[in-house]
Amino acid sequence: MTLKIGTRGSLLATTQSGHVRDDLRPYEAELVIVTTHGDVNMAPVERIGVGVFTQALREELHTGGCDIAVHSFKDLPTELDPRFHLVVPKRADFRDCLIARDGLSLADLPAGALIGTGAPRRISQIKALRPDVECVPLRGNIDTRMGKVTSGELDAVVLAYAGLTRVGRGDEATQVFDPQDFLPAPAQGALAVECRADDAYAREAIDSICDEQAQVCAVTERVVLNRLEAGCTAPVAAHATLNDGTLTLTAAVIALDGSKVVRRELSAPVAENVALAEELTRALIADGAATILG
């Protein structure tokens, strides 16, 4: 049986899904391109809604148009969908990166520099580090975004480093941000591979590529987002690491103008990952996170 893998049609999406297809061997699989609302609507993601890139893929999966769907985990709604079984394969680099003119870093950009990004989490952290630069809304694929720098329209853009490396352009980053200074989105760099919950063969296939450490870290990060009742476009950042059975979770909520940052870090045994995320969320709220999120 050949499994059909539903994917968006962009270079990044088909590259990511191609890696999943290859990793599934000896299970036979092929890619099926699915057009999503987010691919045809260039309005800011925070305006057109959570799930804009994932809803069409999930509908195709639910109705049998494909057997497996591959998403960027950070794009999925934070509530689990009982119709599907989800696994996280080995995680790519979770950091954000800058692609700037003349090889510049964020610190080296001149006052008033134009930086392309539409993500509130990125805007808020850029403004916290460099309140004197301007952030410009930006949508489109990697080539489109980076082309704005090459053409001189923008001084820099901020992208997920994982996406850049997946399409073989990681060496074009002029700065890869230290997560101590610039926390990633919950589950950034992680893929979510789904199949129908009642499809035993597809479940067996995708379970073979599950990375338990990547899954527990990414899921824990997303619990913070869920408990804050914030969508994937909110100015919320989180990252978890697992060492010798201890899970360390760092999360932050940042005002859009960078004027206020609420950040906390806690650790707990990995078996208590959900409780850890909930405790950290309560600490963020106690420190004023809810006020920032409105």
From Swiss-Prot:
Entry-linked Pfam families: Porphobil_deam, Porphobil_deamC
Keywords in alphabetical order: Porphyrin biosynthesis, Transferase
Keyword Transferase (UniProt): yes
InterPro entries: HemC, Porphobilin_deaminase_cofac_BS, Porphobilin_deaminase_N, Porphobilinogen_deaminase_C, Porphobilinogen_deaminase_C_sf
Modified residues (S-(dipyrrolylmethanemethyl)cysteine): 232
Catalytic activity: 4 porphobilinogen + H2O = hydroxymethylbilane + 4 NH4(+)
Needed cofactors: dipyrromethane
Cofactor note: Binds 1 dipyrromethane group covalently.
Pathway assigned in UniProt: Porphyrin-containing compound metabolism; protoporphyrin-IX biosynthesis; coproporphyrinogen-III from 5-aminolevulinate: step 2/4
EC identifiers of the protein: 2.5.1.61
UniProt superkingdom: Bacteria
Stored PROSITE patterns: PORPHOBILINOGEN_DEAM
GO molecular function: hydroxymethylbilane synthase activity
One annotated Gene Ontology cellular component of this protein: cytoplasm
Gene3D superfamilies the record matches: Periplasmic binding protein-like II, Porphobilinogen deaminase, C-terminal domain
Biological process according to GO: protoporphyrinogen IX biosynthetic process
Database matches in HAMAP family: Porphobil_deam
Misc: The porphobilinogen subunits are added to the dipyrromethane group.
Annotated NCBIfam families: hemC
Function of the protein: Tetrapolymerization of the monopyrrole PBG into the hydroxymethylbilane pre-uroporphyrinogen in several discrete steps.
UniProt similarity note: Belongs to the HMBS family.
Subunit comment: Monomer.
The protein's name in its UniProt record: Porphobilinogen deaminase
Organism: Corynebacterium diphtheriae (strain ATCC 700971 / NCTC 13129 / Biotype gravis)
Gene behind the chain: hemC
